[in-house]
Swiss-Prot record:
GO terms for biological process: mitochondrial polycistronic RNA processing; mitochondrial tRNA 3'-end processing; tRNA 3'-end processing. GO terms for molecular function: 3'-tRNA processing endoribonuclease activity; metal ion binding. The keyword Zinc applies. InterPro entries: Metallo-B-lactamas, RibonucZ/Hydroxyglut_hydro, RNZ2-like, tRNase_Z_dom. This is Ribonuclease Z 2, mitochondrial. It comes from Schizosaccharomyces pombe (strain 972 / ATCC 24843). GO terms for cellular component: mitochondrion.
Amino acid sequence: MKASLLVPRRALLFGQLLPPKYSWYSVKRWQSQLTFRNKSKRNTNRIMLSVVSSLNPDSLIAPLLCVSLDNRKYLIGSMGELTQMKFRSQASNYGGKSVSVFLMPPSLQSLNAWGITAGLFGYLQSSGIQNTWGLHAPKPVISIIKKSHHLFSGSPLRLDLNSFSSEDNADATNSFYLDEPEFCTIKGNIYSNWSFLSFNSKEAAGVFNADKALALGVPFGPSNGKLCAGEAVLSKDGTTWIYPHQVVGPPRKRQYFYVLGCSSLSALNQMSKHVDSFSDVYPTCIIHILEKGIWGPEYIKFLSHPKFSRAQHFISCIELASNNPVFQRNKGRNVLPACRDFAAFDIKPSTLDTQTQLPENTYVLKEETSMVLYDEQCKISESPSYSPVKLAKKFSSFNPLPFENEGYTLDVLGTSATCPTWRRSLSSYSVAIDGTVIMLDCGEGAISQFFRQYGTNTEPMLRKLKAIFITHLHSDHYLGLLNVLQAWNKANTNNSMHINIIGPKFLWQWLQRLKSPANLQALLNRIIFIIAKETVTTPLQLTSDLSISSVPSIHINDSYSCIISHTKYGKLVYSGDTRPNEKLVKAGIGASLLLHESTFEDDLKHEAIQRQHSTASEALSVAQSMKAKALILTHFSQRSYDADFLPPDWTIYPKSKTIYANDGLQWQQFQSKQRETI
């Protein structure tokens, strides 16, 4: 009975009536005490490095790495469009963690200040995380974030902004340094044509051996912490001193990895000299982020540097990019390039067959890959994924260029409301008519969807793009605009064409704000901006037969619906976000096609009214009143239209004339059977 009284009270509750020296409870407490005491300050010196996003032929900016060290996380790389989708595929929790973000390009020459931060705003809006992130980036990126504060002002996730500087190193145009005394040191420089980031964890105390401590008679309680802190303690009986080296293992060596960026082969000499400066501790993991044209024999030779002998190399470059779609659960709705000859990158298929030529200890950086750095080793794990070869066979063609004199061709690029889902990107549509292309809204990821839809025909389509209509300034309708404009500008480098943008007045003010930090001076000079309110009474005449007008919608202030009118092929009406609108019905009467939002199912009508949206049956009523020849329902809430959704009232408007839109749908006016691009 005396022995049982010595057992901790909680052990008695669990029926652990063994003497304390051998009780299950005591042993577990001893083993876990060091781990869970002062959790915010512990350092296990084990680094988990995972790939949040990797480079794909249709991804404009990548990659993004997540480094986990105990209860801290560090995001390194670029947060390009649809980063929020990538975060959703990660099991990691960023809520209660201390997070530092380093947005950095491979070099200053390749800096696309908008591109590396375009996905940040959507993530801030949709994450729901209540935390503060320390964000470190070049000054133009910080300036863009500050000037786009309206995009995330209501987010519970706050940003502590820190600009890179050149004060510490006169040779570096941008440099950064972060020291967290208990955990790690991060430093780097971004030069004109290359960059580096080094990540060093701190040496950690050795592992406390609970079994040895029990055997030597270490008193249960604070004595464990004293031994770990380097102090000697007396045994239980008070007769013997017990020293740290008796119960604490040797210190755990610091872990060390590197990120190297390169945009010019002329930088290899400087990079080699930099590697020569490595001291006695060499990195075990090196991430290489390369611009197009860098990967090849010269760079492979650089990988054989003597101080890389212990390192595992991970290469991110378009030449080795995988064929995975952004929306991996929606493979049937994505058109993937069999040859990957995207106009955006101008790559020949023959240059892509290099994965079999990778040197030893060299791997392609992929989202399925994660690395664990521990005990000066880099261990690689790769989760199973679908076969790119099978996908390439399945998606062997792109949409052809729309023919002239065949009426309207509508390509549905995105159909989701508010946030992208695994099956739907954000609102965006492309209309082709008589050799002219018009885009309706540009949600985040619009240009990637455009690439995916037209592939090798992307550049010819962009050369035909004459106008973009932005219905209103909710971010899910215009955050992809800048990347669309930059792609258009690149496709039209050798001509003097202008592009018309119709939208709310504040849209142009925002673009003007970003002119300097995003380097948009030349692009904005090619834009003719028309305030949407003006086209209510004065349509924009694109050709003698084709015009665009607008109708105020019932949604938020300064929001509009769009009507494209052709003298021969009739009207194509796009509702944008709105409640059923009698003015739109009158303006669009007899439309060849009505593209109408259908955010909520009928049983959520009360919410549709509250949020100024429409239900499916309300959209049918608009089509019936308008006498539209065809109706496409789009802009679906994430909570609606699952396998068991409530169908609308088909007595209002014929089901045979109605289509539920999916990303990748192509509607052609004079085809009896509409074709989905699968």
